[in-house]
Amino acid sequence: MDKNTPSGISELITRLRHDRTLTDPEFAALIEYKDELPALTAAADEVRRSVYGDAVFLRGLIEFTNICKNDCYYCGIRCGNKKVERYRLSCEDILSCCDTGYALGYRTFVLQGGEDPYFSTDRLCRILDRIRSKYPDCMITLSVGERSKADYKAFFDAGAGRYLLRHETATDAHYAKLHQESMSLANRKSCLFALKEIGSQVGAGFMVGSPYQTTENLVADLRFLMELDPDMIGIGPFIHHADTPFAAFPDGTLFTTLRLLSILRLCFPHVLLPATTALGTIHPSGRELGLKAGANVVMPNLSPVKTRKLYALYDNKICMGDEAAECRACLERRVASAGYKIVTDVGNVRRT
């Protein structure tokens, strides 16, 4: 069988749906196939509906600090970017965001920030405990980068039942091209496995179309995710930021991101898979197309409008000026237009 013909590709899709894996060359052929693959999109949608129906889960995003000690070459809030106006939200600010979100039906809050030394383990745990005490029916997700296993356990015990930490790329040489020398893929992976060991729901993920990325790198990402078996996988296109070393690199494409969303859904039928803001940034209907390709989570922004423009990981980020209620109503319309419906429960992973 020639895997690069329409019939060969069709067979790969059928086999991937059944076996949840392919060989490395077969994955590469599927990723690189130049034509649209409606059969792949349809298979991914059928699989997501078989597990989650037409439900799309809301995650209220609270970007609580744009201060970061790291200097990742792709990121707009890297410590080396001296043009950024830095901010931190207080515990009361964060609780106010949660109040707004709860009234709008959000039952998961995602606290995301740079690796800001001010937010010590104790300080973060106090914030988590306040949220958990006020909203015991909600799930808290934390995303604050690489910490020790003891820190992760403390966060988990304080109420953060989920943790997001994108691995960004599963290839050492590629990782080294994207990050400062003091950072390592080995440590990033070790953090992810530590999170699993303590019982946290874990999210990993990667950029699509990042500088120097090859198809082989993407296949390695799929293999690593199979090893990790996360509860959530966040992928989105690389989008350049003007004040980074990667300002002149081309952005990742909608085409390849959607292709990978569908592949991920077939590999991981149970996974929680966001249609990211970055998708909506590179295409006006990016998030709707992401849902149709297999995604089942959206993450509207609950951060104060005055700080949103300061949390610019990449250029032209959407939804910078909308009040939380506007974001909620807009997303509800978008989700419905794609043929799904927003649900307001905590949206736990459904493993079979």
Tell me the role of every PLM-derived stretch.
Residues 52-93:
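Canonical Radical SAM [4Fe-4S] cluster-binding loop centered on the CxxxCxxC motif
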Residues 1-38, 102, 226-352:
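Auxiliary Fe-S-binding modules of radical SAM enzymes
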Residues 79-95, 101-122, 128-192, 201-208, ...:
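Core AdoMet radical
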